[in-house]
């Protein structure tokens, strides 16, 4: 790497301008570079910190436009399409003077990374699709409902279960950042394989997680429905697909479909995780990601 790239990858927070919108990113760790796109859309990036990964990789955490200290579009909370996020990712790669890079996307961030890899194969060295799926829409929602029903059966006797169920019911009426954060914190136990069995460990995340309300509409108020199934056969970059056995949102069914559809793919099922394997099984997760991005860094 040249001196410009080294400076722009120095530890800490950085800000660039992407077509008039501030785009922040945060650099942590040491080793080969991997950009990390968080989920939501709208969840503040800090939940995705991966200290075990940072021991072997330089992780560039993207703070997506519309969230945290990054700028907001004039059309906020609308207009945050995968194409918009992809343009910001490519602008960041240009700023870092990286001809190619590995991209990790968690949940909705996985949707963005898939899109970026399909649109810009020359800029993507490989992708980590972490709790992603090949599609959204009615089929995805139906699968999530079935998974949530299974979660409620497993936890039927837990006195805190009604709070989680109420949070799921409130998702359809979110209209501002405060409501988004409240619902997110209410949902969080369902995103772990065994939240209540490890509540002391996970409670600080639940208390601190924040975000910004971002709709699923483009700037013309048209819903962005994703279906990458036909396109994924053309995804040229190697892929690592990671899923938690107990993920209720982007579960094993979708991970297996991604693994089948992408020509050069490998699948890791984290048997003791839900949606947050980097927190629930950090060492297994980190070894898989680092071995994929930089096997020589062992």
Give the role of each language-model region.
Residues 148, 158-230, 237:
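Alpha/beta-hydrolase
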Residues 127-170:
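Flexible "cap/lid" loop of the alpha/beta hydrolase fold
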Residues 99-143:
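Conserved hydrolase catalytic core segment
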Residues 246-250:
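Acidic catalytic loop of the alpha/beta-hydrolase fold
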Residues 15-78, 92:
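Conserved HGGG/HGGXW glycine-rich cap/lid loop of the alpha/beta-hydrolase fold
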Residues 235, 241-243:
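Short beta-strand/loop motif that positions the catalytic acidic residue
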Residues 265-298:
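Catalytic active-site module of serine/aspartate enzymes centered on a nucleophile-bearing elbow/loop
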Residues 61-104, 108, 287:
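Active-site loop/oxyanion-hole signature of alpha/beta-hydrolase fold enzymes
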């Amino acid at each position: 790497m040249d001196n410009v790239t080294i400076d722009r990858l120095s530890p800490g927070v950085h800000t660039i301008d992407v077509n008039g919108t501030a785009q922040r990113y945060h650099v942590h760790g040491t080793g080969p570079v991997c950009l990390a796109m968080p989920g939501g859309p709208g969840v503040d990036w800090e939940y995705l910190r991966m200290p075990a990964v940072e021991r072997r990789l330089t992780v560039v955490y993207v703070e997506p436009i519309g969230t945290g200290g990054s700028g907001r579009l004039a059309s906020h909370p609308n207009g945050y399409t995968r194409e918009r996020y992809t343009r910001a990712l490519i602008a960041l790669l240009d700023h870092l003077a990286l001809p190619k890079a590995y991209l990790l996307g968690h949940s909705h961030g996985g949707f963005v990374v898939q899109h970026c890899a399909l649109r810009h194969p020359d800029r993507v060295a490989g992708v980590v699709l972490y709790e992603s799926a090949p599609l959204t829409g009615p089929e995805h929602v139906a699968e999530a409902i079935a998974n949530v029903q299974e979660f409620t059966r497993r936890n039927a006797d837990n006195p805190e279960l009604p709070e989680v169920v109420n949070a799921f019911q409130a998702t359809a009426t979110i209209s501002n950042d405060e409501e988004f954060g409240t619902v997110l914190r209410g949902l969080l136990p369902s995103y772990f394989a065994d939240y209540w069995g490890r509540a002391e460990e996970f409670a600080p995340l639940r208390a601190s997680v924040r975000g910004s309300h971002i709709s699923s509409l483009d700037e013309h108020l048209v819903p962005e429905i994703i279906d990458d199934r036909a396109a994924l056969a053309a995804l040229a970059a190697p892929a690592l697909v990671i899923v938690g056995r107990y993920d209720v949102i982007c579960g094993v069914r979708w991970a297996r479909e991604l693994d089948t559809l992408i020509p050069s793919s490998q699948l890791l099922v984290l048997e003791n995780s839900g949606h947050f394997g980097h927190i629930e099984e950090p060492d297994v997760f980190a070894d898989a990601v680092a071995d994929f991005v930089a096997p020589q860094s062992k």
